[in-house]
Amino acid sequence: MNSADFDIPFSSQSTEDWKNRVTKELKGKSFSDFLEWRSVDGFKIDSWQDSTDNAPIDLPPLKSPWKLLHPVYNEDAVTANAEALNALMNGAESIWFDKGFLGAAEILAHKDIDTSVAPVFTRSSSIFDVFQEFLKNDVEPDLTQADKNGLINGLRLRERGASIVQEVAYSISQGISLLNSGAKNENIYFNTGIGTSYLAEIAKTRALRLLWSNVLRVSGDTEENPRLIGINLSIDYPQADEYNNILRATTSALSGILGGVEFMMIEPWNRQWSDELQFSSRISRNIQNLIRDEGRLEKNLNAADGSYFLDQLTQQIAKEA
């Protein structure tokens, strides 16, 4: 076969040419009704994107895979420790104690957990104590630094009805306040609620990364990704057809991971109405095990990069925040 047979000229088509052709095919129906994506948060984006109006986003690259954060709700220190150790032996890479333990109970809860390998967090009403920074051998924590280590709790805001843009705006402003008070970037954690609006949540997480890297650049620090802890928004999970919540949790996990969180936690789908969490906790943990071991997303750290659609949505959220 002659190579000349492949020399078929193709004329370039502009975005406007494409839209005109589509409008013709729609036979009078509205282009925007069919081919503009609208999110529940009010974002409107053309479903067809190219490089014409999309400059690449300068996001700091992710350097390591996310860590599977397993929640422990038991209020007994010994039982909580046993659950944590079991989770770490079955795929978990970090632990979240929903109850804070003090004194001897704290020692029991953290027994045999190497916090240099598996970070341990505890929930608090006002501060996120990062125990892997404190629990080093028998050294007492420097309590004078406690107010310089904290959590920006965007999750709580989302649970109370805040929009994606409101969460981002609040989180960044609180982060700036912590920096101004003397906190170091590596000690600031952003707890972000991950809902089920798949693309919007990916873009929201990337918008947090984009804005925080800009904050660090302006303040003279090295541009880095924020320390993001993604937690699925399980507060709205219905009890009816409860196993459908597994799909909702999977969507949230993928959004957080593709968006670039450092830690991802999936709460049990029946957390809001049941105390029997052993089975649902295992399933929630295995959602991320499957994403990691079968989806292999830990091998592609920046999978969302290069998407014109996600880049434009990321910029919209960042601009409105």
Go through the PLM ranges and name each one.
Residues G150-R156, S163, G230-P238, Y243-A249, ...:
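Anaerobic metallocofactor- and corrinoid-dependent redox/one-carbon enzyme cores
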Residues G42, G91, W212, G259, ...:
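Conserved, mostly hydrophobic/aromatic
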Residues M1-E201, S219-I229, I257, F263-E267, ...:
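Catalytic alpha/beta active-site cores
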Residues T251, E262-A321:
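Active-site or pore-adjacent capping/gating segments
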Residues T196-A207, S234-L247, D275-S284, F309-A321:
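Short glycine/threonine-rich loop-to-helix capping motif typified by GTGT followed
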Residues S173-N180, Y243-V261, I283-R292:
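Glycine-rich and small/hydrophobic secondary-structure elements
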Residues A84-M89, A207-L210, S281-R282:
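Short, solvent-exposed amphipathic alpha-helical segments in soluble enzyme
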Residues I176-N180, R206-R217:
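Short, well-ordered amphipathic alpha-helices
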